[in-house]
């Protein structure tokens, strides 16, 4: 049996040794034939992949609400500075936007459980950009109120997600979007960390940089590794 599997693996290595990542992130053989349209379906370098927490999978809806939802009766003056609160309250639909974001979090939870984990929910997921670590390494515990409000955070989160993609024609960054929405949740950032606008900017800049650093390099020979992983 060992000799058979060894033979099969050698055959696979021989057949796949010329596979490499092209500049459009497709995997092609030496003849230019496409084997995979996007390397690994996300174009991320496996050497950067690591386990990171999801926070919401095994929590009840009530617990998620407590951690991640600002209700309509939130006392904003206790959490964010007056100017920041004033900017938000000028938007008559600010609560609708908060509600919509929370529904999105719950939809993410359902997607992870049913699609990603196939009804066997896990607390962690493998992905290159460890957002929680970036947050904790670039934020300081303090007693001052935040000078950035939830609506500003949601708007900037959306901008971050939109600019982190592989190709203009391939913007499948669903897992990244979920991780951003979870870890950069306004209530977590404001209530737990009292985040400042400066800290938020530093964090999102580093997330953007890490996302781009984690992409597979065009020209990388990936066939042998893939063959040995089967």
Q: What do the predicted segments below correspond to?
A:
Residues 1-230:
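Core, soluble structural subunits of large cytosolic macromolecular machines
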């Amino acid at each position: 049996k060992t000799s058979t599997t060894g033979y099969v693996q050698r055959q696979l290595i021989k057949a796949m040794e010329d596979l490499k990542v092209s500049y459009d992130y497709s995997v092609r053989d030496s003849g230019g034939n496409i084997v995979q349209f996007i390397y690994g379906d996300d174009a991320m370098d496996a050497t950067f992949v690591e386990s990171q927490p999801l926070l919401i999978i095994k929590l009840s809806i009530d617990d998620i609400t407590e951690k991640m939802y600002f209700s309509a009766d939130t006392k904003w003056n206790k959490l964010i500075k007056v100017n920041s609160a004033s900017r938000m309250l000028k938007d008559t639909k600010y609560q609708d936007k908060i509600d919509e974001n929370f529904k999105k979090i719950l939809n993410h939870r359902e997607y992870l459980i049913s699609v990603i984990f196939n009804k066997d929910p896990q607390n962690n997921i493998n992905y290159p950009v460890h957002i929680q670590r970036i947050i904790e390494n670039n934020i300081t515990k303090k007693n001052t109120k935040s000078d950035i409000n939830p609506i500003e955070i949601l708007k900037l989160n959306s901008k971050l997600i939109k600019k982190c993609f592989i190709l203009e024609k391939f913007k499948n960054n669903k897992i990244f979007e979920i991780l951003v929405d979870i870890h950069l949740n306004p209530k977590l950032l404001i209530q737990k960390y009292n985040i400042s606008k400066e800290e938020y900017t530093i964090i999102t800049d580093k997330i953007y940089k890490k996302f781009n650093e984690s992409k597979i390099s065009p020209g990388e020979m990936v066939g042998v590794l893939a063959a040995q992983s089967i």
